[in-house]
Amino acid sequence: MEEVVITSAIRTPIGGFQGELDCFSASDLGGMAIDGAMKQAGIDRVDEVIMGIVLGAGQGQAPARQASFAAGLDETIPATTLNKMCGSGMKAAMIGFDQIKLGQSKILAVGGMESMSNAPYLLPKMRGGARLGHGKVIDHMFHDGLEDAYEPGRLMGTFAEDCAEKYQFTREAQDEYALKSLENSLSAQKSKVFENEIMPIETVDRKGKKRTIVLDEQPQNAQPEKIPNLKPAFRKDGTVTPANSSSISDGGAALILSSRVYSEKMGLPIRARILTHSSYAQAPGLFTTAPIYAVQKLLKSLSWTADMVDLWEVNEAFAVVPMALSLIHI
């Protein structure tokens, strides 16, 4: 089977909620990332575009195809949109890996995109008409993104609270993790660590002034001195706060994946190779610890041990997620 490599990797800056990037749709942001990744790779065509998105309501048909067109790709290139919640972009990369590994594709654009700022409100039961009484308005972001589908109205952050309680992660420990993460982000911005992976975005601010955005928005606006005093976000006496949870954000990211044989034949850059991937599922309310078992499954498939890996990148949806993963010495 084919060896799969990463040819290029580009993302937009990450915008805050109703912040610098709220004038762009998710497909706009995805298109920018795809365009940047293709330019970085030095190509003008791929076999297919695969993009993940969670909040698709109001986006119009086939958001991935819209992103493909926004990137200037030809209309003969297929595009696939998928939704796997927070793992949507990663799943797009996994599917792309499988297609190339099996020889079904030679080169693909894969990634994820989201504009939480533009998530619409929904009007249930309006299709048949509201005959009498008050109607109801539902927040698409909450209903389809931040709330549990099996316990309607229950925010996913309450499951983070359950995790903190089970593993005795204190408020102080979570805040310390959040502060360290913020410190790392600001340090990376200052030293321009992410400069080569961020595609600058041209926009016009609310005062009509043209701006070029090159930095992630939220770390710059954070006020670390206030973090210890923030109120819990999900339970009155809880430990999970807005600071030790992830931000509501906008952005897009894309990879160009190809087979090693194709990359070498076409003289394309090879930045890394992908060996394999794994998925793991358990009860939805236990999502905070699912990465532990996905990692163990992955290591077993490679006959590796955790100490053979130099760097782990873990989704920080809540501080308790990487903190839980550290329990297996990662």
PLM region spans:
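Conserved active-site "lid/cap" helical segment
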Residues: 1-59, 63-71, 78, 162-171, ...
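Beta-strand segments within the central parallel beta-sheet cores of soluble alpha/beta enzyme folds
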Residues: 6, 45-52, 79-81, 108-113, ...
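N-terminal extracellular/periplasmic Venus flytrap/periplasmic-binding protein-like
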Residues: 11-12, 22-32, 40, 173-265
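Active-site pocket-shaping loop/turn-to-helix segments
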Residues: 12-38, 55-57, 80-94, 106, ...
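Active-site-proximal alpha-helical scaffold in enzymes
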Residues: 82-114, 164-193, 254-261, 326
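Flexible glycine-/small-residue-enriched beta->alpha junction loops
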Residues: 107-162
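Hydrophobic pocket-lining "lid/loop/helix" segments that shape and contact the acyl-thioester
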Residues: 157, 161, 165, 172-183, ...
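Conserved small/polar residues in nucleotide/adenosyl-binding loops
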Residues: 328-330
